[in-house]
Amino acid sequence: MKQPCVYIVASRSRGTLYTGVTANLPRRAFEHREGLVNGFSKKYGCKVLVWYELHESMIEAITREKQIKAYSRAKKIALFAKTNPSWKDLSTDLYSVRKVRRYRTASA
């Protein structure tokens, strides 16, 4: 899944939030989960992918990231409150889709 996107990772349910941007969400989610990203997210243990939004270009994604970073905590939570109310780790879904795509490609 190489596509520009904005994402939010959390330290735990109702915990600290970090907003970021990447062109490779599965890789970046893995890096956060394993503590490979130095800085704020590592310091506060932000490892759970709770929200993401895909974009057509990196410029568009960076613009949106800046917009979201300026949001209050409540407004950030409102982005995913209806679609992910339990703050489930969405990265597991990314890896499942990736494995299915690999399998289909290999067997085709």
Regions found by a protein language model. Name each.
Residues K43, K66-L79:
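Short arginine-rich
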Residues M1-N38, K42-V48, Y52-L54, I59-K66, ...:
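GIY-YIG nuclease catalytic motif and its immediate N-terminal context
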